[in-house]
């Protein structure tokens, strides 16, 4: 922390990279701090600090992480003292707590306190979990909880990648059995006048991201150092574990101005550019761990099975499983595999009493081995395809008659229904988070009901996985959406996963493009997505990598990589990668990207055959007309306490939204209602001065003892005196002839020097 003396670490300091330091900042309290400096060349440098010993001392591991000075978060890692019984998985939980005080704000909820995590917090938690989970030793069954608390944030910064590093650092100090530290970095390809070809900037600010064409988050760990040449210091090898990437909102406009398009080659360059920064961050975390001298704790491990069980299972059912894994139909294959597993359990349970879970785990591992071996040695996939083929595609557009847009996209047994709903800008989603956004115009929701996999389960509020898949599809489509000015609608896109056997998120991208076109949304370009996989292993003593196009669910589970790529025919709009390997060779990644592009182009062609341009908007969708009024007339159009605008809405049935710059959006399902509302708005904002002799069909808005006030135009009333109401007859009460809301034909008889209008009735005959 600031204001304290420092005490340099005496050991291992000379072995640190020059941009990493570690020191004791308070010897009495035992507070240590490691610092990593990120050099961005022309774009300056960033400083990340990891401090331990001051906050949350009772947690197993606690680190306060700083990005420069103003962005601070606390990461804690805590483990239960005993294993959780009755489970066969590692119970890791990652929670992100966004404290509104970190931005100097009070929560907008009724109780004025933080509630359940918002979308940003959930996505950040997933971003941390994905690279952190694989570092834990297999067989751990103790509950582990990582909690990230955002304590201070610069409004121009993003905290999620700092949280990846903080979570890894606190886990390193917890004494838990992990293989290595994890470093995470956000990279943005910033294009400006000084860098027309773009420069990759690490830990960019929000302002720098707005100047970029592509951003990506890369997480990885350091493996064995690479061998340096004679006289050269060896450089660490960085194994990429996770990538989350997407094009920026303005990528189409920036490319038109001459900026480089984020092609597959450019994306691969960005991933490579991230590796030195990851190595620096891992070095800082390791230095802090070594300085604190954390003791490793002993944990009981529960391997899924012992070798004797696996050998028995292999001897019992190897040939049967090999035959079953040639069945192309998912349901038939799953049923046959389940039956074979039960038969194997029945056959071996006497030999291995009370070890049924081991038999089942060994059966699963045998299945995995058979599938991988066939792919590597024979080029044979479960459903008979080669490694570059796409499953059969099916497309149906305008499936739902009352929806504004809909489309069904099928890829093999994966079936996605995309549904588009359009509404006025008043329906934008209000956002109460730490980010600068206060509203969102494009909303993408993804639903994954249990019946999509033939199972039962909970339905209702979305799970973290559904929120993550929806965010990925949203990221893929946002760069090609029309601007507010071009298309002044709020767009809600829903992806219904009706059947799942591999990459429903990429199926959602395809279904959404088709549905948006069907709704009449003028996309800048169609977008399609494909899921890739990877299987690696030794064949004839040599390491072999096989990239798989359009993976099945089983290939996802048994493979080494889940790699999703979405984009147009020209560039990538979204990418997500998770790998289980210690390292992904650059040439393998480049090959997989190229293979994904070929598949994407094939899918885009089939989508174009189904619908190649936006359809006419549905008659059920609101028609929105945009007009402009002088800013000094906004108050008159709204009226006191909204009286005038509410009156126009009530009389015409149109919805009206007024922006601060005088832009007015008028929407109605029927065109006549919108035209009537526009006419009334123009009458106020650009009025024609009423003159004696003008006639109007007015509305009674108020009655008094001396007459009735008649609304002629919005904001302009006239008085029909009681003496003129009855014609030749004398009336005692205005209400005997007229009441509020009545329509009456009147003529302007006089306008005095104060602008007061006197009216006389007009004989309708």
From Swiss-Prot:
Gene Ontology molecular function terms on file: 3'-5'-RNA exonuclease activity; magnesium ion binding; polyribonucleotide nucleotidyltransferase activity; RNA binding
Xref: CDD domains: KH-I_PNPase, RNase_PH_PNPase_2, S1_PNPase
Domain of life from the UniProt record: Bacteria
EC number per UniProt: 2.7.7.8
Pfam families listed in its UniProt record: KH_1 (PF00013), PNPase (PF03726), RNase_PH (PF01138), S1 (PF00575)
Primary location group: cytoplasm
GO cellular component, one term: cytosol
Domain annotation KH: ranges: 622-681
Cofactor: Mg(2+)
Keyword Nucleotide-binding: no
Cellular compartment(s): Cytoplasm
UniProt keyword list: Cytoplasm, Magnesium, Metal-binding, Nucleotidyltransferase, RNA-binding, Transferase
InterPro entries per UniProt: ExoRNase_PH_dom1 (IPR001247), ExoRNase_PH_dom2_sf (IPR036345), GPSI/PNP (IPR014069), KH_dom (IPR004087), KH_dom_type_1 (IPR004088), KH_dom_type_1_sf (IPR036612), NA-bd_OB-fold (IPR012340), PNPase (IPR012162)
Alphabetized Gene3D superfamilies for the sequence: GHMP Kinase, N-terminal domain, K Homology domain, type 1, Nucleic acid-binding proteins
Reaction it catalyzes: RNA(n+1) + phosphate = RNA(n) + a ribonucleoside 5'-diphosphate
EC class of the enzyme, as a word: transferase
S1 motif domain boundaries: 693-762
Role noted for this protein: Involved in mRNA degradation. Catalyzes the phosphorolysis of single-stranded polyribonucleotides processively in the 3'- to 5'-direction.
Similarity field: Belongs to the polyribonucleotide nucleotidyltransferase family.
Protein name as it appears in the record: Polyribonucleotide nucleotidyltransferase
């Amino acid at each position: 922390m600031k204001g304290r003396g420092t005490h340099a670490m005496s050991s291992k300091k000379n072995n640190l990279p020059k941009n990493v330091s570690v020191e004791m900042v308070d010897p009495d309290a035992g507070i240590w701090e490691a610092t990593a400096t990120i050099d961005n060349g022309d774009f300056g440098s960033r400083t990340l600090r990891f401090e331990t010993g001051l906050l949350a001392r009772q947690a197993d591991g606690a680190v306060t992480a700083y990005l420069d000075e103003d962005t601070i978060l606390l990461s804690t890692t805590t483990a239960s003292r005993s294993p959780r019984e009755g489970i066969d998985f590692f119970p890791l939980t990652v929670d992100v707590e966004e404290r509104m005080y970190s931005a100097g704000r009070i929560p907008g909820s009724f109780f004025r306190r933080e509630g359940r995590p918002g979308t940003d917090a959930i996505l950040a938690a997933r971003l941390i979990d994905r690279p952190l989970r694989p570092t834990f030793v297999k067989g751990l069954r103790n509950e582990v909880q990582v909690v990230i608390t955002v304590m201070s944030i610069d409004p121009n910064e993003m905290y999620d990648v700092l949280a990846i590093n903080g979570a890894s650092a606190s886990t390193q100090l917890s004494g838990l059995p992990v293989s290595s530290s994890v470093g995470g970095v956000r990279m943005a390809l910033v294009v400006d006048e000084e860098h027309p070809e773009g420069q990759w900037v690490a830990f960019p600010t929000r302002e720098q991201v707005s100047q970029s064409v592509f951003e990506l988050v890369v997480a990885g760990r350091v493996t064995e150092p690479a061998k340096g040449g004679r006289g050269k210091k060896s450089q660490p090898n960085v194994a990429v574990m996770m990538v989350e990437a997407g094009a920026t909102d303005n990528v189409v406009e920036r490319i038109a101005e001459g900026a480089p398009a984020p092609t597959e080659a450019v994306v691969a360059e960005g991933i490579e550019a991230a590796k030195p920064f990851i190595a620096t961050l891992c070095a800082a975390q390791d230095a802090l761990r070594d300085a604190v001298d954390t003791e490793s704790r002993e944990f009981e491990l529960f391997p899924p099975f012992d070798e004797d069980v696996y050998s028995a299972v292999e001897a019992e059912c190897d040939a049967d499983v090999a035959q079953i894994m040639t069945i192309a139909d998912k349901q038939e294959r799953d049923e046959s595999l389940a039956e074979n597993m039960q038969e194997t359990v029945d056959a071996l349970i006497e030999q291995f009493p009370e070890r049924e879970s081991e038999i089942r785990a060994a059966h699963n591992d045998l299945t995995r081995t058979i599938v991988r071996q066939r792919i590597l040695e024979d080029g044979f996939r479960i459903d008979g395809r080669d490694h570059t083929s796409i499953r059969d595609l099916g497309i149906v557009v305008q499936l739902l008659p009352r929806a504004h847009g809909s489309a069904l996209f099928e890829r093999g047994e994966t079936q996605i229904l995309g549904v588009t709903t359009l509404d006025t800008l008043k329906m934008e989603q209000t956002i109460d988070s730490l980010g600068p956004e206060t509203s969102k115009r494009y909303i993408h929701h993804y639903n994954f009901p249990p019946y999509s996999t033939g199972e039962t389960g909970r339905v209702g509020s979305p799970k973290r996985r559904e929120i993550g898949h929806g965010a990925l599809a949203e990221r893929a489509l946002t760069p090609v959406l029309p601007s507010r000015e071009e298309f002044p609608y709020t767009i809600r896109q829903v992806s219904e996963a009706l059947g799942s056997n591999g990459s429903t998120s990429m199926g959602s991208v395809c279904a959404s493009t088709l549905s948006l076109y069907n709704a009449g949304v003028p996309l800048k370009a169609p977008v399609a997505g494909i899921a890739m996989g990877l299987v690696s292993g030794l064949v004839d003593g040599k390491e072999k990598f096989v990239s798989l196009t359009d993976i099945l669910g089983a290939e996802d589970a048994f493979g080494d990589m889940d790699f999703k790529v979405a984009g147009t025919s020209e560039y990538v709009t979204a990418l997500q990668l998770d790998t289980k390997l210690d390292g992904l060779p650059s040439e393998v990644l480049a090959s997989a990207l190229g293979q994904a592009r070929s598949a994407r182009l094939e899918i885009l062609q089939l989508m174009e055959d189904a619908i190649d341009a936006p359809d006419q908007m549905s008659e059920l969708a609101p028609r929105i007309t945009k007009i402009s009024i002088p800013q000094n007339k906004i108050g008159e159009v709204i009226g006191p306490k909204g009286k005038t605008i509410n009156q126009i809405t009530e009389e015409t049935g149109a919805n009206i939204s007024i922006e601060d710059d005088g832009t007015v959006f008028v929407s109605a399902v029927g065109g006549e209602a919108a035209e009537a509302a526009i006419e009334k708005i123009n009458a106020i904002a650009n009025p024609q001065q009423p003159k004696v002799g003008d006639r109007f069909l007015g509305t009674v808005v108020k009655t008094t003892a001396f007459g009735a006030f008649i609304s002629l135009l919005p904001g302009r009333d006239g008085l029909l005196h009681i003496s003129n109401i009855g014609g030749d007859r004398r009336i005692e009460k205005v209400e005997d002839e007229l009441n509020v809301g009545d329509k009456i034909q009147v003529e302007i008889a006089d306008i005095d020097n104060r602008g007061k209008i006197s009216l006389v009735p007009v004989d309708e005959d």
